[in-house]
Curated annotation (Swiss-Prot):
It comes from Clostridium tetani (strain Massachusetts / E88). InterPro entries: Elong-fact-P_C, NA-bd_OB-fold, Rib_uL2_dom2, Transl_elong_fac_P/YeiP, Transl_elong_KOW-like, Transl_elong_P/YeiP_cen, Transl_elong_P/YeiP_CS, Transl_elongation_fac_P. The gene is efp. Pathway: Protein biosynthesis; polypeptide chain elongation. CDD domains: S1_EF-P_repeat_1, S1_EF-P_repeat_2. It is found in: Cytoplasm. Keywords: Cytoplasm, Elongation factor, Protein biosynthesis. Belongs to the elongation factor P family. This is Elongation factor P. It holds the Pfam family EFP.
Length: 185
């Protein structure tokens, strides 16, 4: 059992016969009245979003989630195909199932696919990926101010804020959990 006060992003639990994963949460402690937890939940099976508030002492049954590493193969524009390395079985996933991770995945990279009762519902990118910059504005010569960032597009199409010294063609390491630049590779 998990209590509402212990909910965090990524937790998966059962509520009213459905399985939800926590997309966002906020613990609210008003000056008057009881504390509560405001959550944004995604239905694991149909992808629907639901915003709900809970009393922090409410308890839920945790859902058993299977995690399997699979290789991202390709997209046909509508579906994204992943392959199990042991059975060579390919599974197609739609954009709603891959949206958080796909902006950091290149073809042939490995990702964690989450399953509930044999049904794939979510993709988790590796914590760190190395991608090449395909477009960014050139940094001004001599501009060495610290913590000044500029937008850069990487080879997967994601936009990441990078320091001024990063140029097109450079490879960088990105933390996929936050979408932030880590270092030049």
């Amino acid at each position: 059992m998990i209590s509402a006060g212990d909910l965090r992003k990524g937790n998966t639990f059962e509520l009213d016969g459905q399985v939800y994963t926590v997309v966002d949460f906020l613990h609210v402690k008003p000056g008057k009245g009881a504390a509560f937890v405001r959550t944004k939940l995604r239905n694991v099976l149909n992808g629907g979003l639901k915003e709900t508030t809970f009393n922090p002492t409410e308890k839920f049954q945790e859902a058993v989630i299977e995690r399997k590493e699979m290789q991202y193969l390709y997209t046909d524009g509508e579906l994204y195909y992943f392959m199990d390395q042991q059975t060579f079985e390919q599974i197609p996933l739609n954009f709603e199932q891959v949206e958080g991770a796909i902006k950091f995945l290149k073809e042939n990279m490995f990702a964690i696919i989450k399953f509930y009762k044999g049904e794939a519902f979510s993709v988790e990118a590796p914590n760190f990926v190395e991608l090449q910059i395909t477009h960014t504005d050139p940094g001004a010569k001599g501009n060495t101010a610290t913590n000044v960032m500029k937008p850069a597009t990487v080879e997967t199409g994601a936009v990441v804020h990078v320091p001024l010294f990063i140029n097109e063609g450079d490879s960088i390491r990105i933390d996929t959990r936050t979408g932030e630049y880590m270092e030049r590779v």
